[in-house]
Swiss-Prot record:
Residues that bind Mg(2+): 42, 575
UniProt cross-references to PANTHER family, sorted A to Z: HYDROGENASE EXPRESSION_FORMATION PROTEIN HUPK, HYDROGENASE-2 LARGE CHAIN
Species of the source: Methanosarcina mazei (strain ATCC BAA-159 / DSM 3647 / Goe1 / Go1 / JCM 11833 / OCM 88) (Methanosarcina frisia)
EC number from the UniProt entry: 1.12.98.3
SUPFAM superfamilies (UniProt xref): HydB/Nqo4-like
Residues bound to Fe cation: 64, 572
Protein origin, superkingdom: Archaea
InterPro entries: Ni-dep_hyd_lsu, Ni-dep_hyd_lsu_Ni_BS, NiFe-Hase_large, NiFe/NiFeSe_hydrgnase_LSU
Keyword S-adenosyl-L-methionine: no
UniProt lineage: Archaea, Methanobacteriati, Methanobacteriota, Stenosarchaea group, Methanomicrobia
Top-tier EC class: oxidoreductase
The protein's name in its UniProt record: F420 non-reducing hydrogenase I large subunit
Binding site for Ni(2+): 61, 64, 569, 572
Biological process (GO), any one: methanogenesis
UniProt-annotated location(s): Cell membrane
Length: 591
């Protein structure tokens, strides 16, 4: 057995350590996911004016500040008793804020944080021996996704075309948010009861111009099939079967045109989505389309025991009507709340079933498995107890372990797409399950994020040009007495998944307790009080460190793929580094 530790896992937000035990066949037999820093924002908020939460919590993360601000605002809407009266145009503008932030986050993750692993030399070793086709595929992967300042065998590699093109689009999306929310990051327009800035006709016109530029990027790089055709036949398809059939037929046409010429370029119709949809999956690429090889990403990052995992979504994006029910996100959200079991059975979401365990975390809470409204944040203060190398039976992470009805929950794009029964992602998950694969894996996780980005582009156009009406009512007044001895719950969807804020106030109307459960905690959590691993840990166990080719303990590209496929944000999950140096990483790999 070989210990393979990635410490830190780079190209994520924050500091993460993944330790694995690997057998002679390259299969991971045990894993620990350790978040290396402690978050103190809940303690900062105590004794503050509740309204400050909408601004202070944005400082938890610079990538998704709007998600925290909106979630806090949702909690404050309930605290002040105004959720059912928030004007329609305020809710639509909140949708626009979040949609732009989520699209920017997804674009950053897909192209800058995750895709560079497709230029890993491990794939060159597998593809180039396949002759002209293999060489053509490898050249495309390198030419699209290589990061800046990249070298292979000491030779500088030009940055990939898709990688470079995505960077200014991230900037453009940030500028769109700043135009209507005041600034980005840390927008100032959020406020309980609505929002503060009445966007003008000129603002909407400028947003529309920006939008067209974003669509130019999508059509040039992300999707070469016409965007409306893609949406109509996937997101709007009448069934999962029809959505999958559309994609496989489209890919078959591309393959028939490209195999003789070995032209897999964007000019030949191979957008980044089409390219990964075909070559990323063993089932789709090799077994359905007859390709000579694939990256086999559907064979890693899955779950061995469906009874120990579920897919949780709190719901996001309000319907364009006045008011909403903060405790029933299934009824008034475009992305509905819900829970899907590991066997793809649909269940009703109940927020009262959420708890957090600290059995394997660096906390000295008085009670384990607490509901978030009663949550405690009491960290270890003795450096001797903060050890990351004690194994699965020890305490080894600053992350707590959120659970839904006692079960680990994957959150994020895949969970959202499954819960809204999005035809393409649901169809792929069902097809994989029917053929003996885990329905959740690196391949479906990444395609879900790509598909969600396309859906957001579609929905944003409606929110900006149809649903929002300049000059409409954007807020309602607050009764500050309503916030005394009160509670509020904010449930929302951040780019990385389900995000919840819980607030309690005292008789003076100040914050008595504040708890956040963030997507990174759901995804990267350690084991719970029952010894059940978190989602990342479960997805690692049973997977190979190299999805293709020979076992290479020095280049475990499979671990990189699996860890980054969740788009973890440890900056959200935990927040103060160990300054003693006692627990400094003993292995440093910059990859």
């Amino acid at each position: 057995m070989v210990n393979v530790t990635v410490d830190p896992l780079t190209r994520i937000e924050g500091h993460q350590r993944i330790s694995t035990e690997v057998d002679a066949n390259g299969v991971i037999t045990d894993a620990q996911s350790s978040s290396l820093i402690f978050r103190g924002f809940e303690r900062i908020l105590q004794h503050q004016d509740p309204r400050d939460a909408a601004f202070l919590t944005q400082r938890i993360c610079g990538v998704c500040p709007l998600s925290h601000g909106l979630t806090a605002t949702n909690a404050l809407d309930e605290l002040y008793g105004v959720a059912e009266h928030v004007p329609k145009d305020a809710l639509v503008m909140r949708n626009i804020f979040q949609g732009l932030n989520m699209a920017a986050s997804h674009a950053t993750h897909i192209y800058v944080l995750w895709a560079p692993d497709l230029a890993n030399p491990a794939y060159k070793k597998v593809l180039t021996p396949l002759g002209d086709t293999g060489n053509a595929v490898w050249d495309e992967m390198l030419g699209r996704f290589a990061p800046i300042s990249y070298k292979m065998d000491g030779v500088p590699i030009p940055a990939g075309s898709s990688y470079l093109a995505a960077i200014p689009e991230k900037k453009r999306l940030q500028e769109m948010i700043a135009l209507i929310a005041g600034r980005m990051p840390g927008p100032s327009a959020l406020y309980p009861g609505g929002y503060t800035y009445p966007a003008t006709v000129a603002d909407i016109t400028k947003l529309s111009t920006y939008y067209l530029q974003i669509m130019d990027f999508i059509s040039a790089h992300t999707l070469r099939v016409p965007f409306d055709t893609w949406i109509e036949n996937t997101y709007k398809a009448s069934s999962p079967t029809k959505a999958v059939s559309f994609v496989t037929e489209h890919l078959t046409d591309l393959i028939n045109k490209s195999t003789t010429s070995n032209d897999f370029s964007k000019e030949a119709g191979w957008g980044d989505t089409e390219f990964y949809a075909a070559f990323g999956s063993e089932l789709v690429g090799e077994k359905l389309l007859g390709l000579p090889a694939s990256l086999k990403h559907d064979t890693i990052g899955g779950y061995q025991d469906p009874s120990k995992i579920c897919f949780v979504a709190y719901g996001g994006y309000y319907k364009p009507t006045d008011g909403y029910d903060p405790r029933s996100p299934a009824g008034d959200r475009i992305f509905t709340s819900g829970v899907v079991s590991g066997n793809l059975e649909y269940l009703k979401f109940d927020p009262d079933k959420i708890t957090e365990s600290t059995a394997h975390s660096f906390y000295q809470n008085s009670v384990n498995d607490l509901p978030p409204v009663k949550g405690e944040t009491v960290p270890f203060t003795d450096p001797e107890k903060i050890v990351y190398t004690g194994g699965s039976d020890s305490q080894y992470s600053w992350d707590k372990a959120p659970r839904y009805d006692g079960i680990a929950g994957e959150v994020g794009p895949l969970a959202r797409m499954l819960n809204i029964k999005e035809p393409l992602v649901t169809g792929l998950a069902l097809a994989l399950a029917e053929n003996g694969y885990s329905p959740a894996n690196v391949y479906t996780r990444m395609l879900a994020r790509i598909q969600e980005t396309a859906i957001l582009a579609y929905e944003l156009l409606n929110w900006v040009t149809v649903d929002y009406e300049p000059g409409g009512k954007i807020s309602v007044p607050l009764d500050f007495n309503a916030a005394k001895d009160s509670q509020g719950m904010g449930l929302w969807e951040a780019p990385r998944g389900a995000l919840g804020h819980w607030i309690s106030t005292n008789g003076s109307g100040k914050v008595a307790n504040y708890q956040c459960i963030v997507p990174g905690s759901w995804l990267m959590s350690p084991r719970d009080s029952n010894g059940i691993p978190g989602p990342l840990e479960q997805s690692l166990i049973g997977s190979k460190i190299n999805p293709v080719g020979e076992v290479d303990y020095t280049n475990p590209v499979g671990i990189f793929h699996m860890g980054r496929s969740y788009d973890p944000c440890i900056s959200c999950a935990v927040h103060t580094i160990d300054l003693t140096g006692k627990c400094a990483p003993n292995t440093l790999r910059i990859l």
